[in-house]
Amino acid sequence: MSEKQMKEAFVSNLNGTTVLEITQGLCFPAFCILCRGFLIIFSQYLCSFSPTWKTRFLTDFVVLIVPMVATLTIWASFILLELLGVIIFGAGLLYQIYRRRTCYARLPFLKILEKFLNISLESEYNPAISCFRVITSAFTAIAILAVDFPLFPRRFAKTELYGTGAMDFGVGGFVFGSAMVCLEVRRRKYMEGSKLHYFTNSLYSVWPLVFLGIGRLAIIKSIGYQEHLTEYGVHWNFFFTIIVVKLITPLLLIIFPLNKSWIIALGITVLYQLALDFTSLKRLILYGTDGSGTRVGLLNANREGIISTLGYVAIHMAGVQTGLYMHKNRSHIKDLIKVACFLLLAAISLFISLYVVQVNVEAVSRRMANLAFCIWIVASSLILLSSLLLGDIILSFAKFLIKGALVPCSWKLIQSPVTNKKHSESLVPEAERMEPSLCLITALNRKQLIFFLLSNITTGLINLMVDTLHSSTLWALFVVNLYMFSNCLIVYVLYLQDKTVQFW
């Protein structure tokens, strides 16, 4: 067996892990981000120096990226303990911040909480959405390289037919996260003009993805790089899936109201599942047109990638609806609490629906992107969003206690208007108003596509230079951390230099 065949076999015929374990793994970085905020506040209280871009980068990398690498590799069997540990650590930091509070030092806790709930917020963007996109991007980047090393648990890799692997969430989470900040969500007035102009711009935005998809295909075929055939097919890749999604969704949003995106998502998934169950569509995906697994012809060669696009369109529409809800103008802490509770209840309802669908209809299948897969992706995305929102609220409370606390990529606090004053008094320090958010989270959010491309390129280069199958645990851990450090540093420097590469 050649090395290419050995590497392909290493990531094939896998069945995944439990939904609960993946959910715990997703929530872990949300609490890491919360602890990051506490550490920044605590360090500002103890030390009065101004952090440089280097210290901010190292802080974010050590507190967020390194634990994520460990969670997907050497600490994979202790996710629940990690989660409990970071919660206890965060609670300890919050208690210390509360004890050292510089605001309302003589007021009892309930009075402080009452004042906090009346605080207003301001932010250029929603920190929870930014952190969601960063977490999914970082998880994906870590996994696409780590999966080729023995230290990466096989249960986290992409499943062959049915099951839930951590990497299965990566593709769906990427689509969902992109949908929450798509042009239709961010600029609703953009769709109120000429529909032809809107669709033309949508077509124009995908042409770079066409080159990226074709370029990736050409490189992989020319160097004989290992491929997982049943993932997308012979020629298809994730770039082509994104292209089709970005071509279909504008047409749907021209026909249907933007705020009814959830109905479109539900309709597509239900009709698609009915087609899988009551037509020959499922047989076509699994066995081709001749029933024996042929790869002759464009459709047979890429049947998984082409047909599963329907599921990703539904996930995108669900992301659009969530983005609309998240971007509504909310200016009070109380409003954020209601949003977090609503998302949490919606996620729980979807997880219950997932159980019912898996028992009575069909198990989760990334290969087909079926109904259960779509429900699982949306439910997991909402549970992560609600965790991040709750973390934002708790971090805002910590900032409320310490005068002048600066935490990049978090809500800015403003005192609620008082009847005898024309304007509200801002709690946002002047430094935070004038200084850009120099943090790794903001950089990865703004440069998500560059980070994704860079991760794919460096993963390929490392696989060509390193014998991943026979690497020791220590060496593999060093390589993966160095790979993430290099990619994050490049993206961070590009962000500081304000180098922007955007296609939509």
From Swiss-Prot:
Primary location class: endoplasmic reticulum
Q: What does the record give as the function of this protein? A: Acyltransferase that catalyzes the acyl transfer from an acyl-CoA at the 2-OH position of the inositol ring of glucosaminyl phosphatidylinositol (GlcN-PI) to generate glucosaminyl acyl phosphatidylinositol (GlcN-(acyl)PI) and participates in the fourth step of GPI-anchor biosynthesis. Required for the transport of GPI-anchored proteins to the plasma membrane. Acetylation during GPI-anchor biosynthesis is not essential for the subsequent mannosylation and is usually removed soon after the attachment of GPIs to proteins.
Q: Does the keyword Endoplasmic reticulum apply?
A: yes
Q: Name one GO biological process term.
A: protein localization to plasma membrane
> Which family does the record assign?
Belongs to the PIGW family.
Q: What is its EC number?
A: 2.3.-.-
The protein's matches in PANTHER family, at most eight in alphabetical order, are given as: PHOSPHATIDYLINOSITOL-GLYCAN BIOSYNTHESIS CLASS W PROTEIN
Per UniProt, subcellular location reads as: Endoplasmic reticulum membrane
Species assigned in the record: Homo sapiens (Human)
Tell me what topology the record assigns in the membrane. Answer: Multi-pass membrane protein
Name by which UniProt lists this protein: Glucosaminyl-phosphatidylinositol-acyltransferase PIGW
- The enzyme class is transferase
